[in-house]
Amino acid sequence: MFDLYINCGGKKLRCGYTTGSCAAAAAKAAAKMLYSQENLEHISINTPKNVELDLHIESVKKGSDYVECCVIKDGGDDPDVTNGIEIWARAEKSEKEYTLKAGIGIGIVKGEGLYVKKGDFAINPVPRIMIEKEVRKVLPQGKGVTITIFVPEGEKIAKKTFNPRLNIVGGISILGTTGIVVPMSEEALKESVKLEISQKVASGYKDLILLFGNMGEDKARELGMDIKKSVIMSNYVGFALECCVENKIEKILIVGHIGKLSKIAAGCFNTHSRVCDVRLEVMALELALMGADKKIVEAVYNEKTTEGAVKIISEEYKDIYERIGYKIKKRIEDFTYGALKAEVIMYCMASGILWDGRSKIDENN
């Protein structure tokens, strides 16, 4: 078991290793056994993070002119769907010094704007470098090898990853910039947001729909929106907006639950509850500014959830959602120094759409 830990929120979490590290290890082991006839149970590789990994070779298959090796992906305490899958590498003797190919279960890139060009197999640049570097360490002088990376369960697993959204079909991607998986890595989540936005731009979109998660996607689909132009930004609102500006996006529509959106109204651009939780304060403040009875303001302020708060707010104060919506719009446009035009659709689970600011915003500009 890989023995590297981090402290996250007071918890000791075990790190893991990427699909790129698995592929590099499997390829190195297969290439070494192809020419040395050794029987290996472990193989060592170095990672871009300068952490040496000693990985177990789970399975080996040999033929007259090839060797196949398997390494099991261990993501540590990171809740990734690729954890536990088999990453295989096949090494075959070749007249050419080094060739990398992809087989079953490795995705093919069908869109623009990613790290790998359209039409190529989805093994990212850093893993490609790692695989070649490690294979060359064990390749005898004057000998050549063709390495094929494949993942038997890749096509099935890929349906649960971001690949379908990124227009990568047929399998998973071989990923990793450091070789090490850091549990609950904020940088990894941000990178997926950045990639998805750049991919949408490369596909020709000038305006995007930003969503917090699957519920927002369901709501957008329910409203008949073009999901192809949507990006799930998770809690990283500010980061997503910066990426939109960087990619010269002209307009964004945020579709979200009032519990998330109300935080933006208060100027919070990371909506994780540990970073910012002013949902009910925002609603109570708006009610007070509208002249609502003190009992209603206090009841909303003391509520446990925004869903509960919505039930308390009477028809008399339904304009609260429009007020919050305009504040969200202004916060976003101020945050991006006017580079983005913002529109907002706010909903809750019990009452549905609370405010659809699209036509209203257009009328007021």
UniProtKB/Swiss-Prot annotation:
GO biological process, one term: methylation
Protein name: Cobalt-precorrin-5B C(1)-methyltransferase
Gene designation per UniProt: cbiD
PANTHER family named in the record: COBALT-PRECORRIN-5B C(1)-METHYLTRANSFERASE (PTHR35863:SF1)
Keyword hit for S-adenosyl-L-methionine: yes
Assigned keywords, A-Z: Cobalamin biosynthesis, Methyltransferase, S-adenosyl-L-methionine, Transferase
Pathway the protein acts in: Cofactor biosynthesis; adenosylcobalamin biosynthesis; cob(II)yrinate a,c-diamide from sirohydrochlorin (anaerobic route): step 6/10
Catalytic activity: Co-precorrin-5B + S-adenosyl-L-methionine = Co-precorrin-6A + S-adenosyl-L-homocysteine
Family of this protein: Belongs to the CbiD family.
EC id: 2.1.1.195
Domain of life: Bacteria
Family matches, as SUPFAM superfamilies: CbiD-like
InterPro entries: CbiD, CbiD_sf
Molecular function terms, GO-annotated: cobalt-precorrin-5B C1-methyltransferase activity
